[in-house]
Design a protein with these regions (language model features):
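Terminal amphipathic helices with adjacent charged low-complexity linkers/tails
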Residues: 1-17, 66, 70, 87, ...
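Short helix/loop capping segments that flank catalytic or ligand/cofactor-binding pockets
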Residues: 2-3, 9-13, 53-56, 101, ...
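Gly-rich Lys/Arg/Thr-decorated short loops/hinges at beta-loop-alpha junctions or inter-strand turns
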Residues: 33, 56-62, 153-159
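N-terminal [4Fe-4S]-dependent radical SAM core
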Residues: 1-43
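Conserved, mostly hydrophobic/aromatic
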Residues: 50, 54, 74, 123, ...
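Iron-sulfur (Fe-S) cluster-binding segments and ferredoxin-like electron-carrier domains
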Residues: 57-73
């Protein structure tokens, strides 16, 4: 490797933001298109990284360690982003949404705060072994909110090989 410019180090080191709440710069007033888009929603990153160690997941390894955003910061960002965009859906995004420690509080806030607007809550990347039925039933009560569960393997042997940590009974 020969750098194209002087002053560029030969070895590039990974940079890591340890406090993702302090360094949070959400796009609070994004450009909203005039047409209906498929992903017509606000996306709120609730945490970065993953506590799981699934052997197939590159993102789980790259974004380590797991870092959660402060729930109060997320509440303020959600309020501002939904008001600024007029979207009727918010996606709580992370590699494993159900592992966020303040998920119940955040979902309850969103339901209470935007009850009159019937804002949908989308929870992608849920783990079968980590979701709470009470939270999920509240999400489903609002409107057409969506839940996306992470795929599991077809056999116990394969689940063991890829380090899913689930049994047939769990599923």
């Amino acid at each position: 490797f020969t750098p194209a410019r002087e002053g560029v180090p030969e070895k590039v080191c990974k940079q890591l933001i340890t406090d993702i709440t302090k360094e949070y710069r959400a796009i609070k007033a994004p450009v909203v298109p005039f047409i209906k888009a498929t992903q017509d929603r606000v996306t709120l990153e609730i945490q970065r990284g993953c506590i799981r160690g699934c052997r197939f997941c590159q993102a789980g390894m790259i974004y380590r360690p797991t870092r959660e955003r402060d729930v109060e910061t997320l509440k303020a960002s959600a309020r501002e982003m939904l008001q600024n965009t007029g979207h009727e859906e918010i996606s709580l995004s992370s590699l494993s949404s159900s592992d966020y420690s303040e998920l119940k509080e955040l979902v309850n806030f969103l339901i209470e705060e935007f009850h009159g607007n019937a804002v949908n809550i989308s929870l992608p990347s849920l783990r079968i072994d980590a979701f709470a039925l009470d939270v999920m039933s509240k999400v489903q009560d609002v409107k057409k909110s969506s839940l996306t569960f992470a795929p599991e393997a077809g056999s116990q042997r394969l689940r063991n090989v890829i380090n899913k940590g689930l049994t047939e009974e769990d599923i």
